Amino acid sequence: APEDAEAFIAAANAENLEAYQVAVVTKEPRMVMEWNGAVIADLSREFLNTNGAVKHAAVRVAEKERAELAKPRFGSLRDMAASLKCASRRGLAERFDSTVGAGSVLMPFGGKTQRTPAQVMAAVFPVLPGQATDQASVMAWGCDPEQTSVDPYIGAYNAVYTSMAKLVAAGADYKKAYLSFQEFFEKLRNEPERWGKPFSALLGTVDAQLELGAAAIGGKDSMSGTFLDLDVPPTLISFAVAPLKTGDVLSPEFKEAGHPVYLFYGADTESLKAAWEALHTLALNGKVRAAWAVENGLSEAVMNMSFGNRIGFAAENMSVSYTHLRAHET
């Protein structure tokens, strides 16, 4: 409301932000701009609602060789650990200071050896001097460039689920999460098959959002293009963020030998969401010591969880229902 303008500007100044009143809402359906006493723009609301000239593009989604997605990714555990997908990227992480602002909840690598990579970034919300909070945000990303190159729909769809799964493994409630996307594609020109790639990818993100009830706020495209015969590969990165108390943030490294290890999964969306909800409830009740969102197979998960505290893993094939787990929450 107009009477709140001064209070709003004062609140912005307290946050070191500049704020100015730049317009007044009127009953007349016209946008009028003045400069030095002269009217420099006078446009009707009807014209603004057209959003300019109507544009159309032909789209053709090409056939996909999805058999490529079913091929084994790695020939051995050593190959997996040495791959770009599964390597720790520790050298890259150490080029950045994760302690700036003293708000970090999770270090980039956990455990006494600092060898288990964190799957999320967790940091306390900034507050004014003299204030304190235990409220943090957790943020995670999802992207598989190989999947997106083969099938942009599958790659983008899975990117959303991967980013959300990492939040759940950190202790967050997926129902409170929001998304943002960063996408890169080749120059589209007037070629329907090129238009089909971003079309498929965005359709994949929409389907995933509708299934999870999560909204995407904004997006970013900063590296799309084509240079001579070199095209930017189809890429869609999903970023997910959710609020979480600092004391409820989970780190992924195994904490102590003898702890049982469970696999939470779902064959379809509804069963997967039920698994996520069961894990979240257990985490809030202090029953979860460590969690990892499976991204590149179970082997990668247990290897990374083992590195931080040098705790091994022995598998035993036993089925446990979520009902059974809930019965043991107390």
Where do the language-model regions lie?
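Glycine/proline-enriched, intrinsically flexible loops and inter-domain linkers
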Residues: 1-328
